[in-house]
Amino acid sequence: MPGIYAVDRITSKRTEYSESSPAKIRDNISSILNRPAAINGASSDLVRNIIDVLNSKGGIIARSITEDTGKAISASRKEIASALKVLRDHVKVKATDRADGSRIAYRSGVSIIYPDVWCPVLSLVERLVPALHTRKLLVVSPDSRAFTAVKMLLDEIDPLTALKAGLVVSLFADQTKTVSIMQRKRISDLLFSGSMEELAKLKHRCDCCSIRAESGEGFSIMVAEDSKLDECAISIADIFLDFSRSPFRRPATVLVEASVEEYLENRLIEEISKHNTGDPFSDSTSVGFVQNPENASTAAAILLSGKNRTHDILHWDGFHDNVFHPALVKDASASSRLRGFNDLPILKMRSMASIQDGFDQVVQSGNLMFASIWSSDPYLEELVSQALPVSSIYFNLVPSVLPVEWKNPLVNENVVQGPSALIKSMLSQKTLLRRK
């Protein structure tokens, strides 16, 4: 019987789902998006394990860890703050001369970044961690919500964490301000989220060791022509609607083989229409369609003007029900035609010539939180695990052709023994994160 497997890219563990997989996958993603900051026995044990291990060995970054079920082990900010106090003595700062005569303070030591609210924050911070312990990092974005949340999260864990780690949070107000901050604080790395035009201008004006850009793609879904299209449409609609209710709303892209594109599009419209669909310009709309890209900018301007019941609120307790969800926009060849929709959840349809072409498009999109691969090809798993830099991958595959166990070469057999064993194994190997 065909089933669906979820592969956790942190623990490399696989979870099998039954034929009711769309609902279970939806619940799994929802639990991550709306993760509570509650204290429980598992979280207390995890923090104690981190403290015990890091008391004996310094200079290590402990990554956030998920259980095999996909649900997060949640720890309170107070507990994490107590763990961070133990680590302060491990932080060392040394100045390094640059060729131009200036000096940069490189920071080494221990940083624990353990986001316990909302997967987009988790995804962002995971990308920040490799640079935090070695360089000053500037976070630049026109979207205040995501990066305000990161700063709030870091400040609540420990007010000194951002300073010690070298993280600088800045909203992308204008080129002059950004470059000024970089020069004043001697920033060596830049994580940028914005348009390609703005990125090109910024590259021209500043001198950084590295610039990592984000495209704004929340997650990508690949659909092959041999998929169960009806089941796929239900799952995509449920996942996207759950995701779009999060305060951190990002576009999603469905990459579908051309032969089944029209059918899948019609099925998606049918499924999303079941969720209180109405006129995109109506005050009572909760889900709407903007199928004509020519009208995208106009629709976005009206929605963001506040004339509709549109909310754009950062709220720790979850999301508001009364959020406008423009659900489906046919992708246009000219990206400028969709300008203005960057801050709204869009489900875009895009053709792919083949699975390999889909991989190429996914990799180029850059900012991924989930990738869902719908196909009956059993060989996709190995290929995608090497090709896609994402945190979770979902497969519609035949269980009989998959191996029973999948060991991560980094943690080996310890992966099945829980967070404590995983952290200790990571500490002993001294290579937690691959540097880019």
Predicted features and spans:
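N-terminal Rossmann-like NAD(P)+-binding subdomain of aldehyde/semialdehyde dehydrogenases
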Residues: 1-102, 123, 130, 274, ...
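Conserved C-terminal structural/oligomerization subdomain of aldehyde/semialdehyde dehydrogenase
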Residues: 8-20, 27, 31-34, 42-48, ...
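Residues at or immediately preceding the N-termini of alpha-helices
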Residues: 22, 40, 175, 229-230, ...
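Residue-level signal for inorganic ion chemistry
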Residues: 32, 65, 135, 168, ...
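Structural signal for hydrophobic packing residues in well-ordered secondary-structure cores
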Residues: 33-40, 51-65, 69, 73, ...
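ALDH superfamily catalytic-core signature
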Residues: 53, 156-161, 184-185, 195-332, ...
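Rossmann-like NAD(P) dinucleotide-binding subdomain of oxidoreductase/dehydrogenase enzymes
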Residues: 94-231, 403, 409
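Residue-level detector of anion-binding/catalytic polar loops
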Residues: 137, 312, 368
